[in-house]
Structure formats: structure tokens, C-alpha cells
């Protein structure tokens, strides 16, 4: 369960089942077992009602490259049933939130990868959904663009329920209030980023490189100085 005001990171290696799970959550493929409910609606039995509540950013967001950014967002708004003055307001809000003002009237096929990603993000929030589902929203972005997307997710997470997938722990630490780790389609861990880090064998560990000294002597010395320390020699370097 993901509540309003919660940002859930969906963490796992490539091929763990993150994208497949998100497609089931958003109703694009039916689950083979179990039930997915969005706002109380079974996505299999009431797909339209469930999808009205969600914004979805797939890993490769489909964009109509012959449209301008404004035209594409206007089309997405109309598909969502937003028209007239409300449509104009929705477009302005999405463009402002995703920092698209400078390319508002630019054709999508001329955009950089970063701006295309923001345009995909904008279509996901065009109808101001209560729930956002995003598949690796920062994948392929440069460091500045990643920072902008993380900041946007944190801001929106104050009033929405957000799920986003990643295979990078740094993404979870930077934006999430809770994280689930999956492997081969199964949950292997569930907790806050700090709780998951504390469970790691490498939590509160340090790596020391030693040059020109006998590693065994240093290991023995550390064991004497810090009685509770566990010293592991990873690689001997003369």
C-alpha cells in the first residue's frame, strides 16, 4: 500500500521485474495472480476509473515528434477530458513544473533527451493525478537534470502517492520515504532507505587502501586499537 504523501522507491537489478510490475499497476498488462487496487478500484475490473487517478511515465515515454511541446500536452489534456480554460491552465502548470518554458513552442523531434524526458514527465502530470507511477524517471539524464527531477518528485510527493523504479540506490536515498527491493519478481526487502542501509553487511563500514606497509601488521594494529572492529583484507598491496 502506498499512501498520499509517500514516495515509494522500487529498487532492483535489471530484469528483476520492476517494469512488469508497474505495467500491472497501471493496467497495461493483467496480473496472473493477486489484485491491484488504485483508489479502491480493481485495475482489471474498473480500468478507466483506476487510470483516471494515475499519471504514468513509462521507461521510454511515447511522444508525437511532429507536435510542439505545447501541442502534445494539449492533446494529452484532451485525451484526459480536459478542455477550454481548464486545458490552458493544465498545460501552463505542467510546463512550469517541468521547466519547459524555453521549448514550449519547439517541435518534439528537435528536443534533447533531457527535454524529451521532461515532456514525458509533463504528460504524466497534465491532469494533476493523485497517484504517479514512473519507470526510471532519471535514466539517461545528466547530473543537473537528475537533480531537477528528484526535486520535482519530492515537491509533488507532499500531496501525491508516488511510485518510481530505479536500480540505483542513490536515487532512493535522494527522494524516497520508503523503498521496496525486488528480485526475480519477489519482494526481498521493505523499509525506509535508512532501515535498508542498516541491514546491509557494508553498513557503517570503511575501505582503507594501504601502500608500502604490511597489511597484516596494520590489521593487527587496528584490531588492538578498535576492539570491536572487524578487519577484512580485500586486496594485499605492497
Q: Where are the predicted features?
A:
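ABC transporter nucleotide-binding domains
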Residues: 1-183, 189
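ABC transporter nucleotide-binding domain
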Residues: 149-237
Amino acid at each position: 500500500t502506498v499512501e498520499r504523501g509517500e514516495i515509494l522507491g522500487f529498487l532492483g537489478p535489471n530484469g528483476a521485474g520492476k517494469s512488469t510490475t508497474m505495467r500491472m499497476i497501471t493496467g497495461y498488462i493483467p496480473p496472473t495472480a493477486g489484485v491491484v487496487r488504485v483508489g479502491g478500484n480493481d485495475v482489471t475490473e474498473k480500468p478507466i476509473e483506476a487510470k483516471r487517478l494515475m499519471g504514468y511515465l513509462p521507461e521510454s515515454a511515447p511522444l508525437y515528434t511532429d507536435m510542439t511541446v505545447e501541442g502534445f500536452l494539449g492533446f494529452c489534456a484532451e485525451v484526459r477530458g480536459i478542455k477550454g480554460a481548464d486545458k490552458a491552465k493544465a498545460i501552463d502548470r505542467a510546463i512550469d513544473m517541468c521547466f519547459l518554458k524555453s521549448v514550449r513552442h519547439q517541435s518534439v523531434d528537435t528536443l534533447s533527451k533531457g527535454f524529451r524526458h521532461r515532456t514525458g514527465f509533463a504528460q504524466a502530470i497534465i491532469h494533476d493525478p493523485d497517484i504517479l507511477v514512473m519507470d526510471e524517471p532519471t535514466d539517461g539524464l545528466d547530473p543537473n537534470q537528475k537533480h531537477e527531477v528528484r526535486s520535482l518528485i519530492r515537491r509533488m510527493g507532499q500531496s501525491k502517492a508516488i511510485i518510481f523504479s530505479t536500480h540505483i540506490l542513490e536515487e532512493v536515498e535522494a527522494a524516497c520515504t520508503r523503498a521496496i527491493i525486488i528480485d526475480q519478481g519477489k519482494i526481498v526487502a521493505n523499509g525506509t532507505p535508512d532501515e535498508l542501509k542498516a541491514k546491509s553487511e557494508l553498513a557503517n563500514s570503511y575501505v582503507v587502501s594501504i601502500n608500502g606497509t604490511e597489511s597484516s601488521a596494520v590489521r593487527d594494529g587496528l584490531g588492538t586499537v578498535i576492539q570491536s572492529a572487524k578487519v577484512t583484507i580485500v586486496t594485499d598491496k605492497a
